[in-house]
From Swiss-Prot:
It is found in: Host nucleus. Residues 1-105 are annotated as: Disordered. Its main location: host cell. Plays a role in limiting the replication of viral DNA in keratinocytes. Recruits the host NCoR/SMRT complex to viral replication foci to mediate repression of both viral replication and transcription. Residues 18-27, 66-76 have a biased composition (Polar residues). This is Protein E8^E2C. The keyword Nucleotide-binding does not apply. The lineage of its organism: Viruses, Monodnaviria, Shotokuvirae, Cossaviricota, Papovaviricetes. GO terms for molecular function: DNA binding; DNA-binding transcription factor activity. Residues 51-65 have a biased composition (Low complexity).
Length: 188
């Protein structure tokens, strides 16, 4: 029978006393002393971890994305420019997406605000509490992964139309120290 102590032990989280003395599959020995077959059975009993689930989902998505071209879905226009010279666009202009760019039905007008992360968060909070009708949605603070951590952060603001974006810029003062970068972004 296992002994239980009533002595206080400093801990960062809650402690739970367990009266069950049987070993579960996750308490099995690990490492070189555990055979391959036993390890396989233990892992099967526990199920796939988050990383394995992510890999399985990625493989399934790749299998589903095999391109198929029929006469009705073939692209009819090519964009100009060195980066997009091989990118095609679908001619289907019947998209139900309300966020439209004249040349791409799946794009929305945006502003990328660039600046100090804390200032961006405060500005976004002020927008949510007073200017909600002047934009559609705002992102959380984000950064480019290839830049050093001490660089500026971004908040992206989406609009339903170029007119709404212009109205936003006419009525909202962008704080000093923030840069507003206008553009279009695919809607996801």
């Amino acid at each position: 029978m296992a002994k239980h102590s009533t002595q206080e032990v400093p801990a960062t989280g809650p402690l739970y006393a367990s009266h069950n003395t049987t070993r579960s599959p996750t308490q099995a020995p690990l490492g070189p002393e555990e055979g391959q077959e036993r390890k396989r059975r233990r892992l099967e009993a526990v199920g796939p971890g988050p990383q394995q689930q992510q890999q399985q989902q990625h493989q399934q998505q790749q299998q589903q994305q095999t391109p198929t071209h029929t006469p009705s879905t073939q692209a009819c226009a090519r964009t100009g420019g060195p980066v997009d010279s091989n990118r095609t666009r679908d001619c289907d202009s019947t998209s139900q997406n309300p966020y439209r760019h004249p040349s791409d039905p799946d794009c929305a007008p945006v502003i990328h605000l660039r600046g100090d992360p804390n200032s961006l968060k405060c500005f976004r909070y002020r927008l949510q509490n007073g200017k909600k009708g002047l934009y559609c949605k705002a992102s959380s603070t984000w950064r480019w992964s290839c830049e050093p951590e001490n660089q500026s952060a971004f908040v992206t603001i989406w609009y339903t139309s170029v007119t709404q974006r212009a109205e936003f810029l006419a009525n909202v003062k962008i704080p000093p120290g923030m840069q507003a970068i206008l553009g279009h972004m695919s809607v996801f």
